[in-house]
């Protein structure tokens, strides 16, 4: 029987999985929400367990590899056996009180130098738990759960913790710190970390020979799902707004990520703003109905900065930046248009920021996430960005599954030679 691969996408509000065949066709996809929220690591594996056990047995019996992506920057302190110590600090949690310590640890040009980065959250966790066994990002912790071995970390997920993918070492003085033993052993995206734990495989009704492959971040997985060409930019319109594109060289700057994916540099940034702020005011049904009342060819006249809370990481890195959500007009449709225009402005500034750092401007933008299905928002973005905007319906879970498929194909090729 043809082998299959599994991708698991751990997002802000829940988990989605995707099963692909060797041709990359999507055979199965399902999702569920976290019971309590992103900060609860137990909910991560509970959601994964629920979705995996729901895969039809005719498919699950053929699985040979899996890969996980997670929210970039959500960090957890845990014991060496993986037991969480308190709650995780979500990616959106800035820790400005750690700024002075960051300056002593890493250069100002390091992606880890920002108080909105993972290193700042690590220092905050170390203040609460001075002797953790491990500090692990969301995807790395779930990989540990599958393996029952929490040693490993994938390089992209640890970028803003201070891992330098160009030098293959921790930035600055990080490795000299007393707590450096809590950091993961880094492996490149697409590397086979080991086989799924035998007892867990049986519990999940999975084959015991499944390989666990180092995945990537949730935003990188979305890009892989879009399968862009060199001239394309990719925007993920999820709870947060993520802009990525392939570049000839890595880009460097606060709030900027440069990851190696498929042998190429994938660079970009993620705003704290996104569709999450829309759901604060409207249900999905209301968003659909109100969007139909919007004329995207006419401006609302509103000038919003729709951040969910104080603080931004990209296109500007400012932990003190305040949201602007007023004045609110009487018309809900006009209010929604103002919010969508504000998000489009953030996106335009994001692409401009990447251009300032050396990236070519995208000739078109491929959109993913729930917001990509909104035609009025698409047109508002086209007007603001000045280029065509297309949609991709493949979920990020399918993107990270491509890494599992790549590892599976490389393993078979090596066996043939």
Regions found by a protein language model. Give the residues of each.
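N-terminal glycine/serine-rich phosphate-binding loop of ATP-dependent small-molecule kinases
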Residues: 1-87, 131-134, 184, 202, ...
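Active-site core segments that coordinate phosphate-bearing ligands/cofactors
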Residues: 6-7, 103-112, 117, 123-137, ...
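A generic structural motif
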Residues: 32-33, 91, 248, 272
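Short, conserved acidic/polar surface loops in the N-terminal third of protein domains
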Residues: 77-81, 100-103, 246
